Structure formats: C-alpha cells, structure tokens
C-alpha cells in the first residue's frame, strides 16, 4: 500500500488526474485494447474530473478507447434525476470528453430484475478484461461505494438496503425529506473492486481522518470496508493533510519521506507498493 499526502483537497484532485492521465497514456489504448477504468461519484472526485476535462481539452489525454464502470447507483431514481449517478457522471464528466456512450457502464437502478442487472454488470467487467484502475472515495465510516460497515469483504455487485445513518446523511440532497431518499442502491462489491489490477482511493477532510487511520494503521475489519485494500497488491491512497490528523506522526513522516524521494507532486513514475 502507498499513501500520498498532499497539502489540500485541490492538490489531491490535481494529483489524481495526472496519475489517471499517465496510466491511460502509458497503456496506449487502441480499438483492440481498451483501458478499463472504474469510477466513483460524490464531492471528493469532482476536482479530479475537472482536471481530466482540462487535460482532454488541451489534447493531453483521450478517452476514445477507454471503457468505464461506475461504482453504484440508487434504486428507483430516474436517470435524469439531479441526484442520480447517471446524471452526476454525464453532467460532471462524460459529456465533456470524447468517450463513446456505449463504453460507459452505470448500473440501472430501474431495471426490472435488479439481481440480473448486478450479475450482468459483473459479466461486462469480465468481458472487458477486468478493471485496470478502480478509483474510489470513502465515507467517514470507511465505506467504499455502498459497501457499508459489516459488508462482506468478498462481496460482488448486488442490491444493498442502505443503513439509517446513510439515509440521514443523504437527506440533505433530497430537500431534507427522508421520504424522498432512496432506501436501496446497486453497488459493486468489495471483492469486485479487489479484482481490479490497481485501486486508487481519494480521502479528503478531517471528518474522514479516523477512517484513514482504520484503513492504514489497524487490521482488516469488515466494519471498516476500506481496510480490505491493505490486502490488494496495488493500492494507492491519496489524501490531504486534514485527513491525516488521526495518523501517528511516524506514519505520516514515513509516507511523506517516500513521496519526497519520488519528487513530490509527480504522478509516481514507476511506483511500486
């Protein structure tokens, strides 16, 4: 596992975008060999998406031969609902780049058979050759996608009933009306993300500091699902200073020292865990 500690949340978005651009360009995707990218929603990756859009406009990266798989989607929200993840991804990223719509994969929360939809999503990932780089964010309780505390660490894409804490946290997006908050979601499993060749997790803000501590300094625990990625061969966590507040000083110095040796701010050329 590698931890990259940067000054601000803006720095995290810029660094992550540079890394994604480098991974795509180094891969040299083509019509016969697509780069497969796993993507999250939420406020944390917005800065990364904005930077990638700029890189695309500048001609530094193309998404023509990129296939994407998103982590999750609410059950029962129309695709054009302003809180659906379809809407989020198209509005904040896809419509601004040169990706082919057929290469975008987002779970359908309105499918007639939700279990079949989840199984199809797993099949599509396999048919694409697996995910090259899966990007995620985490919640204050250490959840990734909708794999909330207590989720199986070998789980696959499935229907999840959302915890009360999640419903209450999401109410602010639905006029603070709990009756409007979707009670279920479709989500990739922890095992689904673990199958990817590389995982990059973005963590910003003091409110996620304890989750980062659990992910880095304590053992693997299904009550903190992000901790599972200690056992992935290529996990890269990118965080800001605020997110390190619960880490030991020795831990922070250790990872900062590695980054300094690799030229701080660069997209970790040739990094190895």
From Swiss-Prot:
Known catalysed reaction(s)?
alpha-D-glucosamine 6-phosphate + H2O = beta-D-fructose 6-phosphate + NH4(+)
Q: Identify the metabolic or biological route this protein is part of.
A: Nucleotide-sugar biosynthesis; UDP-N-acetyl-alpha-D-glucosamine biosynthesis; alpha-D-glucosamine 6-phosphate from D-fructose 6-phosphate: step 1/1
What keyword terms does UniProt attach to this protein? Answer: Carbohydrate metabolism, Cytoplasm, Hydrolase
Q: Which residues form the active site?
A: 72 (proton acceptor), 141 (for ring-opening step), 143 (proton acceptor), 148 (for ring-opening step)
**GO biological process assignments:** carbohydrate metabolic process; generation of precursor metabolites and energy; glucosamine catabolic process; N-acetylglucosamine catabolic process; N-acetylglucosamine metabolic process; N-acetylneuraminate catabolic process; UDP-N-acetylglucosamine biosynthetic process
InterPro entries noted in UniProt: Glc/Gal-6P_isomerase, Glucosamine6P_isomerase, Glucosamine6P_isomerase_CS, NagB/RpiA_transferase-like
* A Pfam family recorded for this sequence: Glucosamine_iso
Q: Superkingdom, according to UniProt?
A: Eukaryota
State its location(s): Cytoplasm
Q: Which GO terms describe its cellular component?
A: cytoplasm
Which HAMAP family does the entry mention? GlcN6P_deamin
Regarding protein family, the annotation reads:
Belongs to the glucosamine/galactosamine-6-phosphate isomerase family.
Q: How does it assemble?
A: Homohexamer.
What is this protein's name?
Glucosamine-6-phosphate deaminase
């Amino acid at each position: 596992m590698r931890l990259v500690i940067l000054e601000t949340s803006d720095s995290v978005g810029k660094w992550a975008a540079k890394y994604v651009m480098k991974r795509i360009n180094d891969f040299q995707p083509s019509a016969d060999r697509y780069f497969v990218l796993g993507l999250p929603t939420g406020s944390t990756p917005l800065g990364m998406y904005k930077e990638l859009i700029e890189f695309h406009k500048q001609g530094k990266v193309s998404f023509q031969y990129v296939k994407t798989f998103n982590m999750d989607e609410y059950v029962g929200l129309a695709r054009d609902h302003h809180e659906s993840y379809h809407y989020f991804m198209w509005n904040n990223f896809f419509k601004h780049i040169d990706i082919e719509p057929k290469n975008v994969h987002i779970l359908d929360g309105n499918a007639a058979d939700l279990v079949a939809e989840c199984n199809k999503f797993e099949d599509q990932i396999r048919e694409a050759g697996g995910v090259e780089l899966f990007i995620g964010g985490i919640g204050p309780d250490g959840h990734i996608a909708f794999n909330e505390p207590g989720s199986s660490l070998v789980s696959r894409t499935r229907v999840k009933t959302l915890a009360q804490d999640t419903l209450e946290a999401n109410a602010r997006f639905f006029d603070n009306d709990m009756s409007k908050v979707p009670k279920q979601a479709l989500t990739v499993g922890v095992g689904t993300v673990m199958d990817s060749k590389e995982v990059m997790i973005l963590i910003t803000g003091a409110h996620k500091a304890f989750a980062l501590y659990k992910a880095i300094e304590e053992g693997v625990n299904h009550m903190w699902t992000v901790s599972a990625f200690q056992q992935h061969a290529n996990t890269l966590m990118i965080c800001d200073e605020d997110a390190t507040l619960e880490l030991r000083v020795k831990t922070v110095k250790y990872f900062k020292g590695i980054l300094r040796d690799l030229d701080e701010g660069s997209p970790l050329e040739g990094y190895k865990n």
